[in-house]
Amino acid sequence: TNETENYMPVTLDLAQLIMRVLADIRKEGKQMTYLRPDSKSQVTVEYSEEGIPQRIDTIVVSTQHDEFDDDDERMLAKIKDDVLNILMPRVKAEIHSEKVLSLFGDDIKYFVNPTGKFVIGGPHGDTGLTGRKIIVDTYGGKGAHGGGAFSGKDPSKVDRSAAYAARHIAKNMVAAGVADEMLVQVSYAIGVAEPVNIYVNTYGRSRVQMSDAEIAQKISKLFDLRPKAIERTLKLRQPIYRETAAYGHMGRKNEIVEKTFTSRYHETKVMKLELFTWEKLDRVDDIKREFGL
């Protein structure tokens, strides 16, 4: 979707940003010094009937904290005040899109630690935790999800590699101007390399004079979606996944970094690695040519 500069749903993008800034404040140790690592956020946005974001309705922030005051009400009031006056101004300062900033009005409802004090967190507070949160790892509930978690799977599993490929396709298609919003769904049969189906939904926001089914046919012509080809194209057989452990797998920054690895035999290897290859806008020109844009 073109809601944000990184082609992500604005609801998830803002929730992830709130969490990153909150973590920065905690690690700096200068303000909100009571913060602990466990935290979560949710952003609710009002949309028009045409699917355009209109305003932020609600922001929820729950954060673990030290028990720094004997009076629970006073402690919770302090946390909420700091969220409003320390956290949120820093969050807004990180946003460079006027379109996104315009969603912040004076009537936003803030719920900060709405269940009360949050001193015990992590596995200590919740036994029987789920695996990686697959919706937060993708699009925050917008669109659809195949149901398989990413973390823990090697890239031969289409649960992971094809989800990255679908993201790569949808992002490049929207960036090329084919549609303002697009869902790309790829279906596979076990033991069959070629996808059995490619489904596209532009939610009525296509910019080209063709059906979603015709767009899907163009995608199958432009992109090789066999698992081995996806691995090769997106360089998925590299040690590039540590950064996906927090803040989601989609909408992240594509960059080249240098990493140092040490084996059990104390051998050191330095590698230059490209992170989040599925976020590259490297097929925009090909798409424009194919669609005559």
Which positions does each model-derived feature cover?
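Short, charged, low-complexity patches
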Residues: Y7-T11, A15, D72, L76-K80, ...
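Predominant activation on well-ordered alpha-helical scaffold segments within soluble catalytic domains
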Residues: L12-A23, K80-P89, K133, D137, ...
